[in-house]
Amino acid sequence: MRLEDFNYVLPKELIAQQPAEPRDSCRLLMVDKKTGEWQHRRFGDILDEIRPGDVFVFNNTKVIPARLFGRRKETGGRVEALLLTPKGNDVWEILVNPGRKALPGQEIEFSENFSCTVIDKTEFGGRLVKFHYSGDFDNWLDQLGEMPTPPYIHKKLENKDEYQTVYAKFKGSAAAPTAGLHFTPELLEKMKDKGAELLFVTLHVGIGTFRPVAEENIEDHEMHREWYTIEKETAQKVNEAKEEGRRIIAVGTTSVRTLESAGQTGRVEAGSSWTQLYIYPGYQWQVVDAIVTNFHLPESTLIMMMASFAGREHILAAYEEAVRQKYRFFSFGDAMFLR
């Protein structure tokens, strides 16, 4: 299939610059994956769709304030760094802007007592660096770092928690699993009262999630790697639900990717691993029965995933309807429920 097959026209004013308040007051486009028929609702109305025994799977990764601003020690030139992946012993893979001059041996200072030294280059233009600091690394990030919001969000966050799910637990993401931003503690309790089972997996979202597809033939695209963990009890509960014919509802594309990566045999396997799973039309779904998701960028791997799940024509028609009805798009935007 061609990249242009997943394009749609989006007016810039529909790109949400801040989250809905309260979180579950955003709009919800419910789409039947078999017929393509839709309904316009509010996110809190998802309670009306819950069947007793439904299993909702959330990604409990926590976004770190991974964007740092510093200067090159030798020249004083300004540098922006984005932390991607911890490698152990204070070594991280990062992106550096401007990166051309970030050569091995160069030192970047973010504060008087917090700096890093470039060790090597990595794939996709990254750098391997070792941090030098006194005290606690996380405290330095909290003090100096900014939340790495996507490039299409131009408004500065009023509060770091705006870009964090209410159930975020394990630090490690360079971007939020944004479908989860719509859930409030009160809504989660009401879901349990309706008979839903809430489970959690962890996938640390990498900056590769924003990397555009450059290949015209989508099959030629190389998917980025992300690290996920599924606990033994979670895997058992998902497998039991599948055996009993209960729905597995993934909250967000990262939960989808985790479940499908661990479920390639038809049963979800517990453990931790890297995944490069690339889901596009033609993929054989193994685990997920329904998806709560946001509206994704044109020609992105995420809209391809949705097209694989519900059909390209159904997805593009739903997106066109969302544009007509002036839904809010992308990370802070409104949501879809594909079921």
Predicted features and spans:
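Surface-exposed, charge/polar-rich loops and edge strands
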Residues: 1-339
